[in-house]
Amino acid sequence: MKNLLTNPQPSQSDYINAIVKLGSRVYEAAQVTPLQKMGKLSERLHNNIWIKREDRQPVNSFKLRGAYAMISSLSAEQKAAGVIAASAGNHAQGVALSAKQLGLKALIVMPQNTPSIKVDAVRGFGGEVLLHGANFDEAKAKAIELSKEKNMTFIPPFDHPLVIAGQGTLAMEMLQQVADLDYVFVQVGGGGLAAGVAILLKQFMPEIKIIGVESKDSACLKAALDKGEPTDLTHIGLFADGVAVKRIGDETFRLCQQYLDDMVLVDSDEVCAAMKDLFENVRAVAEPSGALGLAGLKKYVKQNHIEGKNMAAILSGANLNFHTLRYVSERCEIGENREALLAVTMPEQPGSFLKFAYVLGNRAVTEFSYRYADDKRACVFVGVRTTNEQEKADIIADLTKNGFDVEDMSDDDIAKTHVRYLMGGRAANDNERLYTFEFPEQKGALLKFLETLQNRWNISLFHYRAHGADYGNILAGFQIEQREQAEFEQGLAQLNYVFEDVTKSKSYRYFLR
């Protein structure tokens, strides 16, 4: 493995040799995981589909492979000094268990707002935890600082040849489990898993197609491919937190650019639908990033009309907060085009509801919200069960033909996350501005929010609903005069929360203003 560490750009053969040599070593901590057939989904999509069950690892994710590969390769002197890492997720647990298995000290620096369930998990695997900083970048900076002070080895989450090679042992298993795969779909966060899997499979199966899958709101590889080099994202979504990476690694980008055949981006609703498929097919409960590869597989098959092929995706992890499942159950039907969310305007007069019901006929209504607004028209928020995109189009056409104004809200995130729970009627606030905030799930966060803004501006609307993630999503309305807009946004900047002005949202216009 000497070439892997001394060559600034290790070759494919350098990586293959390292993966083969690490194969026996990694299994001192990790396990060979099954490649399981998804029968129902295979029938539905007319392809043979397998799922690689990395949720069966001792830390419930693939991250153990790369962490153990690197830590076990350290010199005796490095091992004696211990290892350090920065993470609020699966990498932290992989490093902690690897160090415990090898009898080493492990210090994990985690952001101060890390949920206690994740802190306890790291401690349960034998790691010492230091809570520091408001976000991952601050925690990482502290970890690197301490690694120099204490002479401990910093274990990166993805951008290191040994970590990449460790993840590649997963692909070695896949070769032995199904010999004739046509496609493999791999989730991309920092790129370590995708790079390790692609470089090995392309060596032994040159014709195989390796497809990278990213979340639309944290697509750091796509941004790097577009620019030609790794670049920082200005904002990342946090639902699939296991792949919520601001910047892809330099080495992982080099390998992904060379060995991936294509990319597909998926949204959170499509991820939720894939999580449901995993449960229904193999009774696995995946974390959102764990289901990302399968979500990409489903989308790619439909977009490219592929049939009769052998395909695999990786269930990369299952470390999720149980309360996340409530959000998943609400959103998975939209991700499969099995539910349409519509805003319907009708005359405010007797018989309108009955006519509306006649047009819908025997279709299953999943949600129906209405409140009186004025004497002329009524706006109704309705969910209707559908079987596909065409049926939704047919419903909209039927309603329009019968004199109803219809807006499709199925892709309106404000409607799906907030407005469907806020059917209290309109407010005559001409100077109201509407904002969304990513809100940390930690003690004192709401107090900080109110102390910064409440004394100066009146809050006219507020909606928050927890769904088990490290960050929640808040919708808030403020009464702001036009001349105060700049001053108000300066106040928002002091919060250090991600925010967006959504005053022009069509769901806000329909139901709340």
UniProtKB/Swiss-Prot annotation:
Family matches, as Gene3D superfamilies: 3.40.50.1100, Biosynthetic Threonine Deaminase, Domain 3 (3.40.1020.10)
PROSITE patterns: ACT_LIKE (PS51672), DEHYDRATASE_SER_THR (PS00165)
Domain ACT-like: residue ranges: 340-411, 433-504
Entry binding sites for pyridoxal 5'-phosphate: N90, G189, G190, G191, G192, L193, S316
UniProtKB keywords: Amino-acid biosynthesis, Branched-chain amino acid biosynthesis, Isoleucine biosynthesis, Lyase, Pyridoxal phosphate, Repeat
Cofactor(s) required, per the database record: pyridoxal 5'-phosphate
Signal peptide from the UniProt entry: none
Pathway per the UniProt entry: Amino-acid biosynthesis; L-isoleucine biosynthesis; 2-oxobutanoate from L-threonine: step 1/1
Substrates-to-products reaction catalysed: L-threonine = 2-oxobutanoate + NH4(+)
A GO MF label: pyridoxal phosphate binding
Location of N6-(pyridoxal phosphate)lysine modifications: K63
Enzyme Commission (EC) number: 4.3.1.19
Pfam families: PALP (PF00291), Thr_dehydrat_C (PF00585)
Subunit: Homotetramer.
Family named by the database record: Belongs to the serine/threonine dehydratase family.
Classification via PANTHER family: THREONINE DEHYDRATASE, MITOCHONDRIAL (PTHR48078:SF11), THREONINE DEHYDRATASE, MITOCHONDRIAL-RELATED (PTHR48078)
Protein's job: Catalyzes the anaerobic formation of alpha-ketobutyrate and ammonia from threonine in a two-step reaction. The first step involved a dehydration of threonine and a production of enamine intermediates (aminocrotonate), which tautomerizes to its imine form (iminobutyrate). Both intermediates are unstable and short-lived. The second step is the nonenzymatic hydrolysis of the enamine/imine intermediates to form 2-ketobutyrate and free ammonia. In the low water environment of the cell, the second step is accelerated by RidA.
Protein's name in the database: L-threonine dehydratase biosynthetic IlvA
Organism for this UniProt entry: Haemophilus influenzae (strain ATCC 51907 / DSM 11121 / KW20 / Rd)
